[in-house]
From Swiss-Prot:
Family stated for the protein in its record: Belongs to the LigB/MhpB extradiol dioxygenase family.
Protein name (Swiss-Prot/TrEMBL): 2,3-dihydroxyphenylpropionate/2,3-dihydroxicinnamic acid 1,2-dioxygenase
Pathway: Aromatic compound metabolism; 3-phenylpropanoate degradation
Keyword Oxidoreductase listed: yes
Signal sequence annotation: none
Annotated catalytic residues: H115, H179
Quaternary structure note: Homotetramer.
UniProt catalytic activity: 3-(2,3-dihydroxyphenyl)propanoate + O2 = (2Z,4E)-2-hydroxy-6-oxonona-2,4-dienedioate + H(+); (2E)-3-(2,3-dihydroxyphenyl)prop-2-enoate + O2 = (2Z,4E,7E)-2-hydroxy-6-oxonona-2,4,7-trienedioate + H(+)
Entry EC no(s): 1.13.11.16
Requisite cofactors: Fe(2+)
Gene3D superfamilies in the cross-refs: LigB-like
Alphabetized UniProt keyword annotations: Aromatic hydrocarbons catabolism, Dioxygenase, Iron, Oxidoreductase
GO molecular function, one term: 3-carboxyethylcatechol 2,3-dioxygenase activity
Length: 312
């Protein structure tokens, strides 16, 4: 039994609003190394903690976290279409284990997932189906949010389960770091926007293209005086990475949602996926971790980081 972890940022603007060629080459190189490590590990199972961006989950029923026994990519921002290769019975066993651990996780037998889940699978495996994968989607953009201590406990429950399998398991967390793309809030939203946030599934191609164009436009001015969005916060990002690398996970229980939103951006809460992933790894004991990469990239509206870890 071997368990390894990779946490990395994702960005729908990759290839659509790129920084300089030298930065793109840096990211390409670190992703190539990460892919090679995944290839060498050859996981028998991947568990991916990921966010959603109002593509599969909406306010008509917004769970704090949900596990899927079947999932299909919405193929936004040019990501791969098609189903994920989910081992249904194993996903159900994991669901029962999480519920028995005192955590009320939601269950979906037909979930739509977006780039927040699929981009990382594509970058690290080249496919949505190469390895068996169980996706766990954590609400990271639609307040109110579950407290961070619940996310840590979710990760711990998942970690206890995967440790019992006797398999090579890769745990992925994807999102963040400091991050504020133009995601609307329900509070105070105009009627049309509110309706989308409540029940906006399966938009027309024209509506999806318009939404993506707004994100690209935001990326072109992000980090300048023209942008109304919270700027990237390198100090916050690096402090968070240090906390994870050093194994200080108990401190996460004291994270305050409003403070993070103000300091690092409203979508920084995608770090919940990193919290769950590291808590899952730590459930089996001490780990060793390393920071593979970090750079604030305004064009991608992301403090872009990559971190790897494994059990000692």
């Amino acid at each position: 039994m071997t368990i390894k972890l990779k946490c990395l940022s994702h960005t729908p603007l990759r290839g659509l609003n790129d920084p300089g060629a030298d930065v793109v080459a840096e990211v390409d190189a670190v992703l190539a190394r990460s892919r090679a490590e995944v290839e060498a590990f050859d996981p028998e199972l991947i568990v991916i903690f990921a966010p959603d961006h109002y593509n599969g989950l909406f306010y008509d029923l917004m769970p704090p976290f949900v596990i899927a026994t079947a999932a299909e990519s919405v193929a936004d921002y040019g990501t791969l279409p098609g189903p994920l290769s989910i081992p249904r019975d194993l996903a159900l066993d994991l669901t029962r284990h999480i519920l028995d651990s005192g955590l009320d996780i939601a269950l979906s037998h037909r979930l739509q997932v977006d780039h927040g889940c699929t981009q990382t699978l594509e970058e690290l495996t080249g496919s949505l189906t190469r390895y068996p994968v169980i996706p766990i989607i954590i609400n990271s953009v639609a307040p109110p949010f579950a407290p961070y201590r619940r996310i840590r406990k979710l990760g711990e429950a998942v970690g206890r389960f995967v440790a019992s399998l006797g398999k090579r398991v890769l745990i992925l967390g994807t999102g963040g770091l400091s991050h504020e793309p133009p995601v609307p809030l329900l509070s105070g939203a105009a009627e049309e926007i509110a309706e989308f946030l409540i029940a906006g599934r399966n938009p027309t191609p024209e509506a999806r293209a318009a939404r993506q164009a707004r994100t690209i436009a935001a990326g072109k001015i992000y980090g300048t005086a023209e942008s109304p969005l919270t700027p990237l916060n390198t100090d916050w990002d690096l402090a968070f990475i240090d906390l994870l690398v050093q194994g200080r996970l108990a401190e996460i229980d004291d994270f305050v949602v409003e403070e993070i939103s103000t300091t690092a951006g409203r979508s920084t809460h995608e770090i919940r996926t990193w919290v769950a992933a590291f808590a899952a790894l730590a459930a089996g004991g001490a780990y060793r971790a390393r920071q593979d990469y970090y750079r604030p990239i305004n064009e991608w509206i992301a403090g872009y980081g990559v971190v790897s870890a494994e059990r000692r």
